[in-house]
């Protein structure tokens, strides 16, 4: 289960490894917050987010 409640509060901070604002990850090293838009399954977990769109540049 997602340790953050970004979808409910719009913001979160998970142990220094993940910081969200308006449910958009600015730093995502673990499956803490959704990096890509909902429905982008390839970015659902274990991602390092590079962008906010669901395409090949989204995750690395």
From Swiss-Prot:
Binding positions for a divalent metal cation 7 per the UniProt entry: 49, 54, 58-59
Coiled coil regions, renumbered to chain: none
The answer, when asked if Iron is one of the entry's keywords, is no
Residues holding a divalent metal cation 4: 32-33, 43, 47
Please give the residue ranges the record annotates as the region Alpha: 29-60
Could you say which residues bind a divalent metal cation 6 here?
A: 36, 40, 43, 59
Q: Does the keyword Metal-binding apply?
A: yes
Entry-linked SUPFAM superfamilies: Metallothionein
Q: Name one Pfam family in it.
A: Metallothio
Give the InterPro entries listed for this entry. Metalthion_dom_sf (IPR017854), Metalthion_dom_sf_vert (IPR023587), Metalthion_vert (IPR000006), Metalthion_vert_metal_BS (IPR018064)
Which BP terms does GO give this entry? response to copper ion
Lineage, top-rank taxon, reads Eukaryota
Residues that coordinate or bind a divalent metal cation 5: 33, 35-36, 49
| Keywords from the UniProt entry | Metal-binding, Metal-thiolate cluster
Looking at the record, which segments are called Beta? Answer: 1-28
Chain sites annotated for binding a divalent metal cation 2: 6, 12, 14, 25
Which amino acid positions bind a divalent metal cation 1, per UniProt? Answer: 4, 6, 20, 23
Residues noted as binding a divalent metal cation 3 in the record, renumbered to the chain:
14, 18, 23, 28
- Similarity comment text for this entry: Belongs to the metallothionein superfamily. Type 1 family.
Q: What does this protein do?
A: Metallothioneins have a high content of cysteine residues that bind various heavy metals.
Could you give the domain comment from the record? Answer: Class I metallothioneins contain 2 metal-binding domains: four divalent ions are chelated within cluster A of the alpha domain and are coordinated via cysteinyl thiolate bridges to 11 cysteine ligands. Cluster B, the corresponding region within the beta domain, can ligate three divalent ions to 9 cysteines.
**The name this protein goes by in its record:** Metallothionein B
């Amino acid at each position: 289960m997602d340790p953050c409640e970004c979808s409910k509060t719009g913001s979160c901070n998970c142990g220094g490894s993940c910081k969200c604002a308006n449910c958009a990850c600015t730093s995502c090293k673990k499956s803490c917050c959704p990096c890509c838009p909902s429905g982008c399954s390839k970015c659902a977990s274990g991602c390092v987010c590079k962008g906010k769109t669901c395409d090949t540049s989204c995750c690395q």
